[in-house]
A protein has these predicted regions:
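Alpha-helix initiation/capping motif
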Residues: 4-8, 134, 166-167
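Extended, charged low-complexity segments
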Residues: 159-184
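Charged interaction/catalytic cores of defense and host-pathogen modules
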Residues: 2-110, 151-154
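Charged/polar low-complexity intrinsically disordered segments, enriched in acidic residues
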Residues: 110-157
Length: 184
């Protein structure tokens, strides 16, 4: 089964949107910062691992660096302070690891979206397909996609789109971009 690039990007972007609050927690010396950071890292790691991204292991490696002071023999500083020090040193790398996963996905999705917007514009202007309320929205989108994938001049672009995103993602992008009132 092909995994939705849109879904992966949304999940990881949502995790990144939570990141500023973690940084603020460190800055404000929030007592729960380490627990919140660990929970965030575990959730992000799970998303990455579940979608077969090796960066999940990198996040786990950063977690191990933060946990390591708990097992150090030195007693010069408390383990918690050493953990906070390590966490502050790796925060950017943690965020950047997730960003580096999202960025190429986002580039492909944006390219596919631009191609789809172009194809939709051409199709709408040609009036080759019109929307009427007797068919449901999903059928309407499927009808447009069928035109894209069978029309001699549009087919190369639809093939290019499928090299960037799955067909399900392409249909979802189309659903986001279509304003039905313009298709009547």
């Amino acid at each position: 089964m092909i995994t939705s690039s849109l879904s992966i990007m949304e999940l990881l972007k949502n995790k990144l949107f939570e990141f500023p609050a973690l940084v603020d927690g460190l800055k404000n010396k929030d007592y729960n910062f380490l627990e919140l950071l660990e929970a965030w890292m575990k959730e992000t790691e799970a998303i990455l691992v579940n979608h077969k991204f090796s960066e999940g292991a990198i996040i786990a490696g950063y977690r191990s660096r933060i946990i390591a002071p708990l097992f150090a023999d030195t007693q010069k500083r408390s383990a918690r302070k050493r953990q906070l020090q390590v966490a502050s040193e790796v925060l950017f790398e943690i965020q950047n690891t997730v960003f580096l996963v999202i960025n190429p996905i986002e580039i492909k999705i944006d390219e596919a979206r631009n191609l789809l917007i172009h194809l939709l514009s051409i199709t709408k202007q040609s009036e080759a397909i019109k929307y009427n309320e007797s068919i449901d929205f999903q059928s309407f989108i499927s009808q447009i996609w069928k035109l894209f994938s069978t029309h001699e001049q549009l087919k190369p672009s639809s093939i290019k789109i499928l090299t960037l995103v799955s067909q399900i993602d392409a249909l979802r992008i189309m659903a986001e971009e279509i304003n039905l009132s313009e298709w009547k």
